[in-house]
């Protein structure tokens, strides 16, 4: 199984500043220009919400202050500027193979 190592586990950022979350896969999840890495936001009592698919593609309706980058094994989620409503847990997830696995999460 592919292991996703997320860092940091928790992150405190002042409103208006930048939050950066990293995700490292135990093997490459990229091929032919596609990276099979996705980012989710989860608030207490709610299901995960897809923010970014295929490393850098913003899901419809998600604010442009969320952005993703990376390829191969190393990926990053950036939030800038951070707003109060961004208080949540963030998870990376790959879809390279079955089983799909998630990172352990980052609490913002």
UniProtKB/Swiss-Prot annotation:
PROSITE patterns per the UniProt record, alphabetical: IG_LIKE
Region feature Complementarity-determining-3, mapped onto this chain: 93-101
Region listing for Framework-2, in residue ranges: 39-53
Coiled-coil segments: none
Keywords, sorted A to Z: Adaptive immunity, Disulfide bond, Immunity, Immunoglobulin
Gene Ontology process terms (BP): adaptive immune response; immune response
Transmembrane segments: none
Region (Framework-3): 61-92
Cysteines engaged in disulfide bonds, as pairs: 23-92
Gene3D superfamilies: Immunoglobulins
Region (Framework-1): 1-23
GO cellular component, one term: immunoglobulin complex
Chain positions covered by the region annotation Complementarity-determining-2: 54-60
A Pfam family matched in the record: V-set
Record region (Complementarity-determining-1): 24-38
Region (Framework-4): 102-108
Record-given protein name: Ig kappa chain V-III region PC 2154
Lineage: Eukaryota, Metazoa, Chordata, Craniata, Vertebrata
């Amino acid at each position: 199984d592919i292991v996703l190592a997320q860092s940091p586990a928790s992150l405190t950022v002042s409103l208006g500043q930048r939050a950066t979350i990293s995700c490292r896969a135990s093997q490459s999840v990229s091929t032919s220009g596609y990276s099979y890495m996705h980012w989710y936001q989860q608030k207490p009592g709610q299901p995960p919400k897809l923010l970014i698919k295929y490393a850098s593609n913003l899901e419809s309706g998600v604010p442009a202050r969320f952005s993703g980058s990376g390829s191969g094994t190393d990926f990053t989620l950036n939030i800038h500027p951070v707003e109060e409503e961004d208080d949540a847990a963030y998870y990376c997830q790959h879809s390279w193979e079955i089983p799909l696995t998630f990172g352990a999460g980052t609490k913002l």
